Regions:
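Bacterial Sec-dependent N-terminal signal peptides
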Residues: 3-8, 13-42, 273-280
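Short aromatic-glycine motifs in intrinsically disordered, low-complexity regions
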Residues: 151-162, 257-260
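Terminal, low-complexity interaction segments
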Residues: 195-280
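Short edge beta-strand/loop segments characteristic of extracellular beta-sandwich folds
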Residues: 172-174, 190-191
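Extended extracellular/luminal ectodomain segments enriched in beta-structured repeat modules
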Residues: 163-170, 241
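N-terminal targeting leaders for non-cytosolic proteins
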Residues: 28-153, 163
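Short glycine-rich beta-strand segments
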Residues: 38, 173-176
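Short coil-to-beta strand junction motifs in C2/discoidin
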Residues: 182-201
């Protein structure tokens, strides 16, 4: 039995901590995708020049982690000649605790702010462990609801671009400032959460044949118990996956489905795989 640990700096500029464990013929590698470093700079919303996801995630916006090939499958929908994000993930560093700012008309155009109790308005220190960058996910799927887009599946999806299965051991989850503001205070478009209402986030894994490998659900918000800091989320039970779809659902609804903002934030995604098996 042999165990070794190494630290690798990718040529692209992303600092990754890679651990290797060799037990007989196994060679297990583990990488934490933290969205930090030079290779990520051009994808961070502040460098793109907007706080609004639909202006950041354009057709040419395609990020990929070099060590794991983790990437986002983004979907946009055109409405009135304007392209809007329907499903996807944007890299951001915006963070704020000013709930009133996210409760006025047009606040949805600041949808890339994560909630951070320590800062009124900042682009530093909003990630897990006071890091800077994270990703904001948007979209969901409510198959029993019909509306302008019918029953289309707009669950934001993370996938491995090379098509090789890996295990996402876990990640950290937080709420966006816009989500916290509306679920806590309510506005003219969506009421605040009431007693007994809750909003959940579900991760569903898929293999190379697009078969489900399992699902894991966490409660993101309840009345008087809204996620406002980074929380660890164990996704290891999904097993080896090629993609993971995230679905945010619950809270008050109308004929169109979920009324609360369909946003959440992820950071420090731990990916594990058997390097010797993938080399075959």
């Amino acid at each position: 039995m042999k165990r070794c640990f190494l630290f690798a700096v990718l040529a692209a500029g992303i600092l990754s901590v890679v651990s290797c464990t060799k037990d007989d013929d196994n060679n297990i590698k583990s990488v934490v995708v933290d969205f930090e470093g030079n290779a990520w700079k051009k994808f961070v919303a502040i460098n793109v020049g907007s706080t609004y996801s639909s202006e950041v995630v354009t057709p040419g916006y395609k990020w990929q982690d070099e060590a794991t090939t983790l990437s986002a499958d983004n979907i946009s929908t055109e409405w009135g000649g304007v392209s809007y994000l329907s499903s996807g993930f944007a890299v951001s560093s915006y963070n704020s605790n000013d709930l009133e700012k996210f409760n006025i008309y047009g606040a949805y155009q600041r949808d890339l702010y994560v909630y951070n109790a320590e800062n009124e308005d900042a682009v530093k220190g909003g990630g897990n462990g006071r890091s800077d960058n994270f990703i904001v996910g948007y979209g969901n799927y409510e198959g029993d609801k019909s509306g302008e887009w019918g029953n289309e599946d707009f669950r934001p999806t993370l996938s491995f671009s090379d098509g090789k299965a890996r295990t996402i051991k876990g990640c950290y989850v937080n709420s966006t400032a816009y989500f916290v503001s509306i679920t806590e205070l309510g506005n003219e478009f969506a009421p605040a959460l009431k007693k007994g209402e809750k909003i959940t986030l579900t991760a569903t894994g898929y293999d190379a044949m697009r078969r489900e490998t399992g699902s894991v659900t966490m409660t993101l918000a309840e009345k008087d118990n809204i996620t406002k800091s980074w929380r660890a989320w164990d996704l290891s039970s999904l097993g080896a996956v090629v993609s993971v779809r995230f679905n945010i659902t619950g809270g008050p609804t109308d004929e169109w489905g979920m009324m609360s903002p369909k946003y959440f934030a992820l950071d420090d995604i731990t990916v594990e795989w058997d390097d010797s098996a993938q080399a075959e």
